[in-house]
Design a protein with these regions (language model features):
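Extended, charge-biased low-complexity segments
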Residues: 2, 6-7, 12-85, 107-118, ...
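Short, surface-exposed beta-edge/turn micro-motifs
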Residues: 94-95
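Conserved small/polar residues in nucleotide/adenosyl-binding loops
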Residues: 150-151
C-alpha cells in the first residue's frame, strides 16, 4: 500500500518506507531464543501466540515462570500467576500485557493496573509496542514522518 504526501495543520507528512513486519526487536538473545522455542513448542505462529510469548520472553523472571503463566496442555493463561511471590513490578506489567493480548484479560478490581498509564511506566515500554504490533499487524504500520515547512512561509 503506497502512502501519499499529506499536509495536516501546517505539517507536511512525508511517507517513509513501510516497516517490514518481519523485523522483530528483541530485548536480548535469550528473549529471541525463548520466543522461537515457545512458538515451536506450541506449533502455532498466530498473533495470539506471537504477542503472548514475545511479552513473556522479555524478562528472565517471566521466561523462568512461563509454566506458571500458561497451561500448555489446555492452551490457557493462568491469571493466578499475577499474585505469585516471584512477580516483581516489571514482571507483573509484562504478565498483564501478555494476558490482555491473549484474550483481553483484565483483573477484576485491579482494572487500573492494566491501563497504559500504569503498564507503560517502565523500561519494558519499547518492547510492549512490539508485542502490540505483533497482535495487530494489520493496524500497526509505521506512520509517515512529519516535516514542518513553516520555515518556507
Amino acid at each position: 500500500m503506497a502512502l501519499e504526501n499529506v499536509t495536516i495543520c501546517g505539517v507536511f507528512l512525508v511517507p517513509e518506507k513501510e516497516r517490514n513486519m518481519s523485523e522483530i526487536r528483541f530485548s536480548s538473545k535469550e528473549h529471541e531464543k525463548f520466543f522461537y522455542q515457545m512458538l515451536a513448542k506450541c506449533g502455532k505462529h498466530d498473533s495470539y501466540y506471537s504477542s503472548f510469548f514475545y511479552c513473556v520472553g522479555i524478562s528472565e523472571d517471566t521466561r523462568n515462570h512461563v509454566d506458571r503463566m500458561f497451561d500448555f496442555k489446555e492452551r490457557l493463561i493462568k491469571p493466578e500467576a499475577l499474585h505469585e511471590g516471584w512477580q516483581t513490578g516489571g514482571s507483573a506489567r509484562l504478565t498483564r500485557l501478555a494476558f490482555n493480548l491473549w484474550n483481553g484479560y483484565v483483573e477484576k478490581g485491579e482494572e487500573s493496573l492494566s491501563t497504559p498509564y500504569e503498564m507503560f511506566d517502565c523500561g519494558y515500554a519499547p518492547y510492549f509496542y512490539e508485542a502490540i504490533r505483533m497482535k495487530y499487524p494489520e493496524y500497526c504500520r509505521e506512520l509517515p514522518q512529519a516535516v514542518s515547512y513553516t520555515h518556507l512561509r
